[in-house]
Amino acid sequence: MNRLLNNPEQVVDEMLAGYIASYPDRFCKLDGYHVLLNKNEKDKVSIVIGAGGGNEPWPIGYVGEGLADACSLGNVFAAPTAKSILNAIRYVPNEKGVLCIATNHAGDVL
C-alpha cells in the first residue's frame, strides 16, 4: 500500500499547513500546538472541538463561518493534550463563553 506522507511524525503539522495554505484568509494555526483557528471573530459563544488527528481529522471541516471557532487535534491515534485545548479556549473570543466538544477517543481515558 502506498502512502502520501512525507514524515509520519509531521503528518498533523503538514495537514494543518496545507489546509491553512488553501484558505489563508480564513484560518491560522496557534503556534506550538495542533490548533486550527477561525480568523473571523464573532460576538457569540465560541465553539472549540477536540479530537484525534491523523487518519480522520474531521474537526477541521467544522471550523469556519457560522461553525466552530477552533479545533485542537492530537497526534495520529491520540487525543489532543489538555494544554492544547486550554490554549485554544484562551485564544478564541471567550467573553460570552466557550462550548467545548470532545470525542470519545480512547486516548482521552488513558
Q: Which role does the model predict for each range below?
A:
Residues 1-47:
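N-terminal amphipathic/basic leader segments beginning at the initiator methionine
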Residues 23, 50-53, 70-71, 102-105:
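Fold-independent oxyanion-binding glycine-rich loops
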Residues 34-65, 72:
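Glycine-rich, flexible N-terminal cofactor/catalytic loop recognition
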Residues 55, 61-95:
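Glycine-rich oxoanion-binding loops at beta->alpha junctions
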Residues 94-110:
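N-terminal glycine-/lysine-enriched basic segments
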Residues 44-48, 75, 96-100:
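Structural motif
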Residues 7-14, 42, 54, 58, ...:
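Conserved active-site and cofactor/substrate-binding residues in soluble primary-metabolism enzymes
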